[in-house]
A protein has these predicted regions:
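Active-site core segments that coordinate phosphate-bearing ligands/cofactors
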Residues: 2-21, 38, 42-221, 226-318
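A conserved helix-loop-beta module that forms one wall/lid of the active-site cleft
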Residues: 20-35
Length: 318
């Protein structure tokens, strides 16, 4: 991937020359990920009993395979809410950035995918739960339901370990007048955490070229995806419905889907048509009416405050 000019789908001659002589000949020509490369090596036939007619479909990495396994479509997002939070994005026009990773789309050669990782995920949520909700997820959820969308203009940044995106550490709280404060009431603290986590995800996704579309849907996985009230905030911030799935090992499932796609005439048949009979995700929540207006006003403010914190911690940009 790092040697590929992803827009032109050819190897970068400058990168090849920097790595090794005659590397292009050794690598071979890049091909669409649905391409059948040939039949399996006789070694695997003799050693492991593969059928000699077994065909090999072009390889991909675990993250692109996960996008295939979750069957994302244009405009969709997958959010893994675990120890670290991870976003998979389907992009039409990427904007490469140091903050995330841009890949060729594994199921549509004309489009792209992006990956964003956030280190302060479930452990940060658990810490605020312990501090502000008596170690109870039930109390945590009650606080989210008791506070209004937008949190009265109170915004928070919660990074107990150095964050990847953005590169900030510490807790920073701002009231509705954009003044930094030392603490929030417990319910406000809980909503500030969850809203802040999801606003950061949307802001940095849009920084890579992502845009929410009318048909956008969000697929949530990971431990926090079992909490409906957390998912409600996610749906409200992105103004898109959130679905959940029981599919585990999405990279393995995606590899199987891709193999099936490759054998079904490859790019001539849309990937979505090949997997349309697979189990569908379940709708968990839909956006609250009026959410779009609330967060359209708050998202730019959150982005400005993030830049303020960054400038205070590492100085103004040159």
């Amino acid at each position: 991937m790092n040697l590929l000019q992803i827009c032109d789908k050819v190897w970068s001659q400058a990168c090849l020359s920097a790595c090794a002589p005659d590397l292009e000949e050794k690598l071979g020509r890049p091909v669409p990920s649905s391409s059948v490369l040939g039949t399996i090596s006789s070694y695997y036939v003799q050693r492991y009993g593969f059928h000699p007619g077994c065909q090999v479909v072009a390889f991909t990495g675990d993250n692109p395979a996960s996008l295939a396994g979750m069957r994302l479509e244009e405009g969709d997002i997958a959010v893994s809410l675990g120890t670290s939070d991870t976003l998979f994005l389907w992009l039409r026009e990427p904007t490469p950035s140091l903050e995330g990773h841009i890949f060729c789309n594994p199921v549509d050669p004309q489009h792209y995918m992006a990956l964003l990782c956030f280190k302060n995920g479930s452990l940060m949520r658990e810490r605020i739960r312990d501090e502000s909700a008596s170690c109870s997820w039930s109390e945590f959820s009650k606080a989210l339901r008791a506070t209004e969308m937008g949190n009265g203009g109170n915004l928070g940044f919660y990074f107990d370990v150095m964050e990847i995106t953005p590169e900030i550490i510490g807790r920073h709280r701002f009231n509705a007048e954009n003044c930094e404060v030392s603490a929030f009431p417990r319910d406000v603290e809980i909503r500030a955490l969850i809203e802040g986590q999801f606003m950061a995800k949307r802001i940095h996704a849009e920084g890579l070229g992502y845009r929410v579309m009318p048909k956008t849907k969000i697929l949530a996985t990971g431990g926090a995806s079992h909490n409906r009230d957390i998912l409600q905030v996610l749906a409200d911030v992105f103004d898109a419905p959130v679905y959940v799935t029981d599919t585990a090992n999405s990279a393995c499932v995606g590899s199987a889907y891709r193999a099936f796609h490759g054998l079904a005439a490859g790019a001539a048949v849309p990937f979505a048509d090949v997997v349309k009979l697979a189990p569908q995700p379940r709708l968990a929540v839909t956006p609250t009416p009026g959410a779009a207006q609330v967060y359209e006003a708050l998202l730019p403010q959150y982005a400005k405050l993030e830049q303020r914190i960054l400038s205070q911690t590492r100085g103004p940009p040159e």
